[in-house]
């Protein structure tokens, strides 16, 4: 076999959402911080295109690049590449990365509990892994500070009329709509319509509401639309359905850890969730993430919460992505039959 490029990947999924991890073959990008390195990847695009575009990737795939940490307290660092964005943080991807690091032996596992610190582009996240028989069975992630931005904002969406939405940040930026008010019961056969409408709502929110992180001037758009199910109080705590539309038009198979963090921030801002509560988010495929609020803080003078999320991930395989020098599509390709819901 001849190849001008070979990238080594361990594939994984967290509660259904693919989060592959590049473990070799890619040099650390330039930049003095992990955030600056992630901005270089977002601008330069070559690596993103190679691993996310067909024939090696697709709209269903997220890919994480392991890089040497910059912060002295971090055990490892990672840069998240999603279909359209290179975000500050991701819940499902942090769970995949933690699982790959421990299950593959890149970082030493200690049973029954391993504690590590990861450096995401948006900052440090503390991780606690429950481990047994050489497997990281459940990952607990102390996510970035999360906050409600707007409550009950009015958003005009062409063809849908005026919607009442919340906006929030949970490590990534969300516009949140009431799923029931949109006519959704959050069932698997609604995925196409949720993806299609969610992209329209996100685009409208970017055009008419806008988002600016108060401490990160580079992050100034909404990434996702969360269709939020009703919150029910059970013997085990709070429980709610969740479906997140991801650009350019797919639904997260997991309950989305940053969405869970954003929703907890909104519920706390409304006085509907306290530090003693636990919220379980349920995805369209029935997988779950669990969340709780560890404390409160401020982000740019705005009230915020310190969320913890937890979930499971599994390694699905190993891959070597190669580039034959005669391949006429060195960065791959994409078509609108899959890249963008209509």
From Swiss-Prot:
Its EC number is 4.2.1.77. Induction: Is slightly up-regulated when the bacterium is grown on t4LHyp or t3LHyp as sole carbon source. Keywords: Lyase, Plasmid. It catalyses: trans-3-hydroxy-L-proline = 1-pyrroline-2-carboxylate + H2O. GO terms for molecular function: 4-hydroxyproline epimerase activity; trans-L-3-hydroxyproline dehydratase activity. InterPro entries: Pro_racemase_fam (IPR008794). It holds the Pfam family Pro_racemase. It is an enzyme of class 4 (lyase). The keyword Lyase applies. Substrate binds at residues 91-92, 252, 257-258. The active site is at residue 90. Catalyzes the dehydration of trans-3-hydroxy-L-proline (t3LHyp) to Delta(1)-pyrroline-2-carboxylate (Pyr2C). Can also catalyze the epimerization of trans-4-hydroxy-L-proline (t4LHyp) to cis-4-hydroxy-D-proline (c4DHyp), albeit with 150-fold lower efficiency. May be involved in the degradation pathway that converts t3LHyp to L-proline, which would allow R.meliloti to grow on t3LHyp as a sole carbon source. Displays no proline racemase activity. Belongs to the proline racemase family. This is Trans-3-hydroxy-L-proline dehydratase. It comes from Rhizobium meliloti (strain 1021) (Ensifer meliloti).
